UniProtKB/Swiss-Prot annotation:
The keyword 4Fe-4S does not apply. This is Translation initiation factor IF-2. NCBIfam families: IF-2 (TIGR00487), small_GTP (TIGR00231). It is found in: Cytoplasm. Residues 605-607 are annotated as: G5. Residues 469-476 are annotated as: G1. Residues 460-627 form the tr-type G domain. It comes from Lawsonia intracellularis (strain PHE/MN1-00). Residues 569-572 are annotated as: G4. SUPFAM superfamilies: Initiation factor IF2/eIF5b, domain 3, P-loop containing nucleoside triphosphate hydrolases, Translation proteins. GO terms for molecular function: GTP binding; GTPase activity; translation initiation factor activity. One of the essential components for the initiation of protein synthesis. Protects formylmethionyl-tRNA from spontaneous hydrolysis and promotes its binding to the 30S ribosomal subunits. Also involved in the hydrolysis of GTP during the formation of the 70S ribosomal complex.
Amino acid sequence: MINDKIKVKDLAIELGVSTKDLLRVLRELEISAKSTISNISIEDLPKIRAQFNTPNTNKEEERRQIQPGVILRRKRQQPSTNQTDIKLNPVDTNVSESTIQTENLILENKNTLSPHIEETTEKIPATTNEILYNSQIAKIVQYPTPSVPNKTLTTTPHQTKKNHSEKDVLESHDSSNKNIKQSSSQNTEKTNRKPAASAIPEGSSAPSLLPPVSEQIRRLHDEETENSSSEEKNVDIQQKEIPSTQVRVISKPNITQSHSWDANNTRSSSGQRTETEKQSNTAPHTDSREHTGHNKRPVSYQGQNRNNFIATPDTIPNVEHDGQNKKKRHTSRRSTEFNHKFQYNNEDDDISRQNRGRKRHKQKTTSQVTTQPIKLTKRKIRVEEAIRVADMAHQMGLKANEIIKVLFNLGVMATINMSLDIDTATLVAAEFGYEVEKIGFTEEDYLVATAPEQSESLKRRPPVVTIMGHVDHGKTSLLDAIRKTNVTGGEAGGITQHIGAYHVTTKSGEIVFLDTPGHEAFTTMRARGAQVTDIVVLVVAADDGVMEQTREAVNHARAANVPIMVAVNKMDKPEANPDRVLRELSDIGLVPEDWGGDTIVTKVSAKSLDGIDELLELLALQTDILELKANPDKPARGHIVEAKLDKGRGPIATVLIQEGTLHQGDTFVCGVFSGRVRAMFNDQGKKVKDAGPSMPIEVQGFEGVPEAGEAFICLPDEKLARRIAESRAIKQREKELAKESRVTLETFLSKTSNEKEAQVLNLVVKSDVQGSLEAILEALRKLSTAKVRINIIHGGSGAITESDILLASASDAIVIGFNVRPTAKVKEVAEQENVDIRFYDIIYKLVEEIKSAMAGLLAPISREVYLGQADVREIFNVPKIGTIAGSHVSDGKVLRNAGVRLLREGVVVYTGGIASLRRFKEDVREVQKGYECGISLENFNDIKLGDVIESFETVEEAASL
């Protein structure tokens, strides 16, 4: 099992992520992991790896506004790309406004904007050409692909090429507008990336990477500038007077490519600056131009470094922090987020620069807000069958003492390691506004039959008939008469103490009989037999009539909704009175057919075999009416009728198959145990290879002794069966711990007071089969009283072992063996450890002796017996002896060795003994009524006339339960 799991911390090292991120993903996937040392199943690894294998290509820059107009920039590592290097050439002074956009933002004051431009490895003059931007946000343009012909514009400080004229711009104006809109609509999602940035102090050199700008957008802008107002033309003239700067290669982008913030990534994957970036260290200067129009231009390029792009809050796209490192987000600098106010809209890419700049107020855009409203999710905690207080506090983000305080208010004494069941956890979580969600492995998905049975696949099966009734009414004898065997002769005391399952072939067909015990201690066995049966045959003795267990059997059959047939047995006895039996049956609701009812009643005699054939015919008729069918071609399902631990073969269980066919080698799950069928035996002890519906078989191959009555289900996968069994064992353990640890103040106080007074009888019980053990434990628990409490230290099926003796020795217990015997070595260990072993084969003898042992634990009861009294009529003071009371015995007698009380006006003045009792001068042992005597009391002389001396004695009696 160890190889099937992996620890959280080992998986985190393997995936290269932090344990905190891994635990977060596990919670999202609803995989139970409470700490870094928790184990994760190998089956869950693929979906965990799928969460971390998705490459994060959105490592971009994050923008924050520290002060009005001041931007915080941080860098994150970006994957290296195979894109071609960008060549920079000198630019002519006549170059008009460009729509170059960048992803790098620097920390700059709004009033003193000082952009920089990166320098290439070639020597570039330090002159700049001032460029104004009308765009609201930075446009992202990717590299062109070979499918689109590139038109390169290269300008030098002293010459300008004429191939980019106004005519070229006009020709490409219409097509470029369409292409830009199409490209923008295709890449709306990709442009809304999360930029990442690294903080750079104000005034320092800011290395920047300028993405290439498409030629068609530049031509559009040239056309706009020619049609603009005279104020714009004056600005262009002012631009030409300034020395030229350098511009990147401008080419037409591929229409199908997306505008990505990290399209032009020239940094290495390690995040180090390149030599080209390090060379950019030009001093900034401010813009001396006046801005006119209704709206001031939000973005401008100033100074000799064009790559330093200053964005006002209007131009900042949405910045999300979901993927950011917490340590990077919370810097020591004061930062203000403005992404909730200024939102980046991808549809602005479809609008011309004219509508984004000075004339933006003239055209209203119907842009939609890209951010979605945050949905309020209910706060939930995940609980399986139970949860510890510490784990619950961890999930709720509280301290454990807060939960303990709530539990104290609910009357529950709690500790930090106490397990809470799901009901208590729900109450506590509601106090803090949380909901409890029950999670865990759901076995119902694999065990519950989903598809209904097809009528063609159903075949007839033998009926399961359970014989029930009062003890000694002849149930097993009747079954022996049907089977022509002698089971009764082999039973201790002639009573049945196990459930017997037998397959019988009769003239009327095959019938499966279940013989249940009739003793009152085997109530659970009878209830279990009624649940798995088709017909109940109620056996009533003709001489005894309806008894207590007869009524109980009727109630079990009615609760299981099973038809009842009555067999009046012992008709051969001369004192048989069947009419009285029928009358008593009518009183409990079983009206015979002869009396106008619907209960089938037949008169039989197991001893003389009278009425047996008639009973079998009635059973066959009832079977035809019920139309019992089952599908033999599906995996087997059934119930455990009886289970035991065999010394040579291990755990063995009697299974009654209800549907399907059980084959040798099948994998099954039963209760908290799983296993594989190693061998199967029928009711006659013969080995069989398979068993169909309604067949009782003995199955060998359990991992442990299952509980009688558990469901037996075959599964196709052994691993699944083991997992279901482990899940059930964990749930059962959590339920037991939660039940034991749930102590209220009332139960705690009552328990402590009872423990001081009550005696405890510790027992270790071993039985031959699981069903008998269940009955014995239930009968012993009923014997507990307020004075003596029975404590079952251990109960199990199988032979008495040395470990049982050592356990009994450590806990001062008595070992009870029911139908089991110890070996010579075990007896020797018991003698050494002074452990008492008691053996029984009849359950009521066991119960009687345990009662006697319980009574022996009680201390004897002291009882006071009144003997008589004497009236004081004279007082004599004798030197050296004291006061002597001359008394007359008015009632009963006064004994010399008895105790006495001195009563004065009805008040007890003295209680003690008699020092001397004399009649005349002789010492006497007793004085009868009507005689006079002299009485002196021990150590007491204050006797007065008129006092009454009462005589009594104390008698000890054995305590009773």
